[in-house]
Amino acid sequence: MSGAGGAGGGVGSQHRKKLRSLLEPEDLLAVLVAALAHDVGHTGQNNAFHVSSSSELAIFYNDKSVLENHHCARLFQVLKDPACDLFASLGKAQRREVRDMIVTMILGTDMGVHFKNVDRLKATIEAGSFDLSNKEDKTFVLEIVLHAADISNPCRPEPVYRLWTDKVMEEFYNQGDAEKAASLPVSKFFDRDTPNVPRCQVGFITFVLMPFYTALSDILDIGPLMTNLKHNLAIMECAAEDKS
């Protein structure tokens, strides 16, 4: 997450400094805990697989943000143990506020709400209505920063990006194998027998990441991340052309 607050200038720097000055210690605690726990207990498949396979988790969470609800629940189950209670020093009202923030941030990592949140971010920026002293606006910024960090692999330096792309694709292929075994339709790009990593990455960067990070760059200094993102897009576009 520190990458989203990288050095730079302009409007982003002003927003970043203001946000930092408005973060209370419990806000920082909530962000750190949400970042650490946002994927706890991940099963290696996505929400669509859980819903289509009628998994126990999908049934338990009524097909709604299945994994994200699961991550939240697992986190707070652990925190109920007095030996693991990170919030022991907080009062009742503070504990509730921190819990609400963490739940909001982790649920915001669901790709099912990605485009809605990007639209909200763009609309708020265009209206000039961000009020970082407002708890709702501040929590929303933290929510989108956590989500940005969660899907930031293409914003990393090329060697790191390639390494983690291979790991992500192997997870996709494992899900594709499970879909075949369950006689379910194989998700696009999840079939290891017909791999096309460059096309997968070009689509993800172009339609998901670039609009999101471009909007985010209006309120946070993420110049180095944007540079990496554009570089990695270019190398994947070249690879996609070579493969076609």
Please name every model-derived segment:
Residues 3-25, 33-244:
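Divalent metal-dependent phosphate-bond-processing catalytic cores, especially two-metal-ion Mg2+/Mn2+ enzymes
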